[in-house]
A protein has these predicted regions:
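Acidic catalytic/metal-coordinating carboxylates
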Residues: 36-39, 60-65
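The feature encodes the CheY-like receiver
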Residues: 15, 33, 54, 59
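Recognition helix of helix-turn-helix DNA-binding domains
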Residues: 169-204
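Active-site beta3 strand of CheY-like receiver
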Residues: 47-53
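Basic, Lys/Arg-enriched C-terminal extension of HTH/homeodomain DNA-binding domains
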Residues: 194-220
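Short, flexible helix-to-coil linker/hinge segments that flank and couple to helix-turn-helix
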Residues: 90-96, 101, 106-157, 161, ...
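Short amphipathic alpha-helix used as the core "switch/output" element in two-component signaling
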Residues: 42, 64-76
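Active-site residues of response regulator receiver
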Residues: 10, 55, 83
Length: 220
C-alpha cells in the first residue's frame, strides 16, 4: 500500500528538492511541486493530492492565502503548513485559513512523514512548541466560569464528550474505544461538531477548546 500523495509548495528550489527526496524515500508519492502559492492552488485543483506541504512566506501568493483558497474549494486535500517561522501570528492565521496542521522545517524527517500520514487521515497536528505555548497561554488565565462555554452550547452532551476527546489530540479510533461506540459514529459526531461550530479542521477545534476553557492543561 502506497503512502499519501503530496504536493510540495516552497519558494526555495533546494528546500523543494530536499523535501521531495525525504518524502519519497519514506513511502509517500510527491505528485508535484510549486514555487509560490498561486501555483500551489492551481496544481492542487489539477492533481488533488492527499496533502499539500505549504510554506507560508512565498511570492505571488503567500501560503496563508493559498491555504484559504484550497480549503474554499472543498477538495479532500489537507494542508500541512511547514515553515521556518514559529510565530504566533503566522500560525494562527494559517490555522484560521483552514490548515490541518503546522510543523517547523527543523522537524526530523521521520516525524515529518508521520505528520503527513496523520493529516492525510483527517487528524489534527500541531508542532510541540505551538502546543506548549497554547497551554502556557491559557493556564495563566483563570477559568472564565464553570459549565459549558456559550459558543459550545449548540453541541449535544455526547458531542461535547467527543469534542473534549478531539481537544486532547485523540484519533477517531481512540475516541471510539474510549466512548465504546463505532468509528462510524465518531466520524458522524466529528463532522457535526465542525459544522455546528463553523470550523474547517480538527486542529481549529483543539485551539477553540483551549480558548473557551473547555479543556484546561492538566485537567479535564
Amino acid at each position: 500500500m502506497t503512502g499519501p500523495t503530496v504536493l510540495v509548495a516552497d519558494d526555495q528550489d533546494l528546500v523543494r528538492s530536499g523535501l521531495e527526496m525525504v518524502i519519497a524515500a519514506r513511502g509517500c508519492e510527491v505528485v508535484g511541486t510549486a514555487p509560490d502559492g498561486r501555483e500551489a492552488v492551481r496544481l492542487t485543483r489539477e492533481l488533488q493530492p492527499d496533502v499539500v506541504l505549504m510554506d507560508i512566506r512565498m511570492p505571488v501568493m503567500d501560503g496563508i492565502a493559498a491555504t484559504r483558497a484550497i480549503v474554499a474549494d472543498q477538495l479532500p486535500t489537507r494542508v500541512l503548513v511547514l515553515t521556518t517561522y514559529d510565530l504566533d501570528s503566522l500560525v494562527y492565521d494559517a490555522l484560521d485559513a483552514g490548515a490541518s496542521g503546522f510543523l517547523l522545517k527543523a522537524t526530523p524527517p521521520d516525524r515529518l512523514v508521520e505528520g503527513i500520514h496523520t493529516v492525510a487521515a483527517g487528524e489534527a497536528l500541531l508542532a510541540p512548541s505551538l502546543t506548549r505555548r497554547l497551554i502556557e497561554e491559557h493556564v495563566s488565565r483563570p477559568p472564565p466560569y464553570d459549565g459549558v462555554p456559550e459558543r459550545l452550547r449548540v453541541l449535544t452532551e455526547r458531542e461535547l464528550e467527543v469534542f473534549g476527546q478531539i481537544a486532547r489530540g485523540r484519533s477517531n479510533d481512540e475516541i471510539a474505544e474510549a466512548l465504546v461506540v463505532s468509528q462510524a459514529t465518531v466520524k458522524t459526531h466529528v463532522n457535526r461538531i465542525l459544522a455546528k461550530l463553523d470550523l474547517s479542521t480538527r486542529v481549529q477545534a483543539v485551539v477553540l477548546a483551549y480558548e473557551t476553557g473547555l479543556v484546561r492543561p492538566g485537567g479535564s
